Amino acid sequence: MYKRQPDTLQKIADSIEKTDPDIVYGETALVDSERRFISMRRLQAPERLSVKSFRMGMLVCHQAFIVRREIAPEYDLRYRFSADFDWCIRCMQMAKTITHTHEVLIDYLNEGVTTANREASLRERYEIMCRYYGTLPTFLRHLWFAVRFAFARFSGRE
């Protein structure tokens, strides 16, 4: 069971002071509208995050992804629902050092804008992935995503 830690901000500050990273990232807890814990996010942040990591989907929520201002580009506003995915990739392309805090950085409301517009979001994300990772590799990975999603739905971890 996840419990909010009162020293999360201090741990983030310590991590930044120790490694001087361009990006700091962590984990995401899903909560309901009354901020009650539901579960940890199904996709966990990888130990070592890189541009290549996002070939497997958005492994880190942008809210749990803290970027040094000097390397942070503007959001690409042609994307209505997946600009965060594109933004995270572009940030990682610019980053020299990326540090995992191993902390839950955010409580994420389970029903956000992207969730409410899932089909449009998935189309945009597919387009972004084709641009960065190639059309054929993206298509093949999406076959795997379909299997992964079906398993998650079947096991109740959608």
Where in this protein do the model-derived segments appear?
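Conserved nucleotide-sugar donor-binding catalytic segment
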Residues: 40-120, 124
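Alpha-helical elements of Rossmann-like donor-binding domains used by nucleotide-donor carbohydrate transfer enzymes
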Residues: 7-15, 86-90, 124-128
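Short, hydrophobic secondary-structure boundary micro-motifs
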Residues: 24, 39-41, 100-101, 137-141
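Secondary-structure boundary motif
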Residues: 14-18, 93, 97, 131
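Conserved donor NDP-sugar-binding/catalytic core segment of glycosyltransferases
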Residues: 6-38
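Acidic catalytic patch
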Residues: 30, 102, 142-144
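Membrane-proximal basic amphipathic "stem/tether" segments
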Residues: 130-158
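Conserved small/polar residues in nucleotide/adenosyl-binding loops
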Residues: 1-5
